[in-house]
């Protein structure tokens, strides 16, 4: 007689797997470790998921990156229009909070998975948005500054989402992070626009308001 699979056990395995993937990364996580975290035997995990790849696909759906990109683009467009708060900000934040550990994987633990390109794509997407707001292409030095800033953004968000004790703490930490990040980004972009207009290519200084951008 075939064993009946229980939704509660499946959910427990998926929760344990997502936490392991977010904490240690896909490559460093074994099915035995997931089983231990779920409080069951490895053989039981394989009754629900034929492989680690199948388990990953269940907890990080294939459409998750595209959904995240759409919300991110909408949020950045709102910021470009001077709307730091509003529906776009709320929708992206809710997505991060609803999919906390899956977003951690997308932003910082994607190596060896079908979403391996997501961390670099996140940074590249934000850099391209920033470049489009400039009157001329940035110099190589200024573009490298943008990459550094947005890579730090990626890492900070992933850290907050992975380490926060609960949804409300994550929300509070992200709000505090943005209160620091957004003014710094405003200062950085003002300096880069000025450099692009005068064609000097000179690097912004702390006096231009860059100090809080990272």
What are these regions (language model features)?
Residues 58, 71-99, 200:
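Hydrophobic alpha-helical connector segments
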Residues 12, 16, 20-54, 58:
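Helix-turn-helix
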Residues 94, 98, 127-132, 147-214:
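C-terminal peripheral helix-coil segments that are non-catalytic and often amphipathic
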Residues 12, 16-23, 66, 70-78, ...:
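Solvent-exposed, amphipathic alpha-helical segments
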Residues 81, 85, 111, 115, ...:
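Residue-level recognition of alpha-helical structural elements
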Residues 104-107:
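Short, hydrophobic secondary-structure boundary micro-motifs
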Residues 68-69, 90-94, 98, 111-137, ...:
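Amphipathic alpha-helical packing segments from all-alpha helical-bundle domains
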Residues 56-63, 115-119:
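Alpha-helical DNA-contacting segments of helix-turn-helix folds
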């Amino acid at each position: 007689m075939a064993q009946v699979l229980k939704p509660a056990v499946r959910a427990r395995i998926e929760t344990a797997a997502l936490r392991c993937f977010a904490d240690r990364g896909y490559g460093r996580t074994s099915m035995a470790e997931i089983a231990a975290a779920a409080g069951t035997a490895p053989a039981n995990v394989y009754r629900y998921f034929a492989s680690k790849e199948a388990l990953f696909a269940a907890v990080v759906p294939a459409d998750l990156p595209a959904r995240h990109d759409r919300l991110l683009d909408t949020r950045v467009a709102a910021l470009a229009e001077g709307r730091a708060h509003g529906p776009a900000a709320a929708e992206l934040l809710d997505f991060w909070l609803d999919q906390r550990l899956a977003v951690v994987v997308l932003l910082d633990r994607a190596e060896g998975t079908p979403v391996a390109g997501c961390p670099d794509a996140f940074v590249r997407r934000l850099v391209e948005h920033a470049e489009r707001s400039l009157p001329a292409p940035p110099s190589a030095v200024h573009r490298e500054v943008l990459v550094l800033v947005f890579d730090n953004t990626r890492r900070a968000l992933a850290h907050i989402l992975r380490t926060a004790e609960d949804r409300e703490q994550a929300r509070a930490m992200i709000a505090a992070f943005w209160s620091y990040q957004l003014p710094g980004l405003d200062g950085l972009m003002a300096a880069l626009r000025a450099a692009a207009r005068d064609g000097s290519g000179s690097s912004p200084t702390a006096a231009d308001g860059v100090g809080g951008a990272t």
